Amino acid sequence: MAEKLIINFDEYTKIVEKLAIQIHKNYNPTVLVGIMRGAAPIIDILSRILKLPIAYIVIQSYSGKGMEDKQGQLMFAREISSLANNEDFNKVLLIDDLSDTGLTPNKSIEWLKNYGPTKDYIKEVKTACLWKKKSSTFEPDFCPVRLDTDPWIVQPTEHYEELSIEEIIKRN
């Protein structure tokens, strides 16, 4: 199993704020598009800071049980979830939590540029993430943390995947 990089909420929000500063100084997107689930909290914070409309694309990667450091085939949802107008998709900032193998951002850009309702409005797609792993072949446009290794990044809410609702009820 890969080494682990454990991130708490304070560290996480500081990294998102650094990403917001990078974006503010270097790009003027018209919409933020988050890759779910990893980008959900990032998009929430960035949209409040940058005052931009948001959209979500849902992608699932299947690699099999017990394969923490492997990525499988990607499956895209049929639609984008957004209240943004089609015209807002002029300058897209596509956001994920991390750049690992590079498969997700590459395939997401391709999918987004071919998505029927907005494809004619998209003039530019740039990318952002919080972490870029050393072995990633994808180079995001904005990334506050570039790692020298390829750790498994344990994000602040990840522990909930290991808890049952019964355990949470007992704690509360």
Regions found by a protein language model. Name each.
Residues 1-172:
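PRPP-associated nucleotide enzymes
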